[in-house]
Amino acid sequence: MREIKSFEKWVKKSLKEHFIFKPYEEFFIVSDGYVGFKILNKCKDYRKVIEEQTFQDLKEDFKIYNRKIEKIGIADIQKEFDISNKEKAIKMPFVYDNIYKARIFKNKENLIFVDDNFLKNIDLYNYDIYAGDPVHPLVFYSKDISYITLPIRMCNFEYEIKEIQGELKCN
């Protein structure tokens, strides 16, 4: 129930700026350009939220940008949710807080920083996490709903994470 309320808040916020809806045969995808949801059609509550907020029948794709509605065209958002070319990642028990408050994820030797605000839309503990490299979207995967978010790109960013007396300090 908490996730559907978070989703509804996200939809309302996205409609003010940028919102994309793309239906497929077994699922649909919604995105605001920074995060996205891939939701099976059997999850009718999520579909109902979108219908109520957009006043659309959800049979065709559309985007809303600056409160204007248009047809998308041939954009294939589905490939971003593909986990076959990504490795399983883990959530590190640290938060990086310099300019952004960011969560840290790790796959292989890569640390991937994600804006904490992008993670408020889901309960992380309900998902398996997959990541490629630090510049491609992370996929939070469950059998009914998958979620993607863009990482904070930190090229040549040198960081050192230290835990001092139970407190995390980042230099």
Task: Identify the role of each PLM range.
Residues 1-25, 29-39:
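Intrinsically disordered, low-complexity linker/loop segments enriched in Gly/Pro
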